[in-house]
Amino acid sequence: MIELIPAIDIIDGKCVRLTQGDYATKKVYNEDPLEVAKMFEGNGIRRLHVVDLDGAREGRIINYRILERIATRTSLIIDFGGGLKQEDDLEIAFESGAQMVTGGSIAVKNPEMFTSWISKFGSEKIILGADAKEKKIAISGWEETTSQELVPFIKGYYDKGITKVICTDIARDGMLQGPAIDLYKEIRDEIPFLYIIASGGVSSIEDIEKLSEAGIPAVIFGKAIYEGKIQLKDLLRFT
């Protein structure tokens, strides 16, 4: 059964969504992310993906107080990303209640440090964030596209011990046009034992079913819930 991971993206302490990572498209869905997290938990959800978009842009963890509130007032298993640049940032995230953290930009800009995190904290706590625009890795809140190819980038870190990756096709993020199933299949075929968490484009229950049928173990979704394209009660069949 595919693992369901709703996303809460945070700017100025509020639950927001962007379209294709563009901060100018910010739309506030709820003033209180804790309220959203409790709603998910009340509908059988066990995992949560929390992104500090302020942190991603500033290069330092900012919204850890929100993380702490969600972690102490729900039982959700939280992975946290955005602005993780130093080991101190990870310590703050873990102390604030995250069970896992996601590193994206840091894995490109400072591979030695990211690799040291895998060694120190273990692959069960460190998730690779591999966000791609036309199969090229994008970083810094998706505002910069690199020349690194997606699949070799992931494979390199798999060889260094990474077991989980969140892969976002930026072109589909927030567009509600369906996930990049062929891309995830390509990664799965190249790295069969990798735990792939699909992200971006989910617009319906049918999209989740297609990912499940394709053998993708987990999916992150956000806008489809916030825009009412997916009803929380419809997710119960997967939980």
UniProtKB/Swiss-Prot annotation:
Transmembrane segments: none annotated. It comes from Parabacteroides distasonis (strain ATCC 8503 / DSM 20701 / CIP 104284 / JCM 5825 / NCTC 11152). Pathway: Amino-acid biosynthesis; L-histidine biosynthesis; L-histidine from 5-phospho-alpha-D-ribose 1-diphosphate: step 4/9. This is 1-(5-phosphoribosyl)-5-[(5-phosphoribosylamino)methylideneamino] imidazole-4-carboxamide isomerase. Keywords: Amino-acid biosynthesis, Cytoplasm, Histidine biosynthesis, Isomerase. Signal peptide: none annotated. Its main location: cytoplasm. It is found in: Cytoplasm.
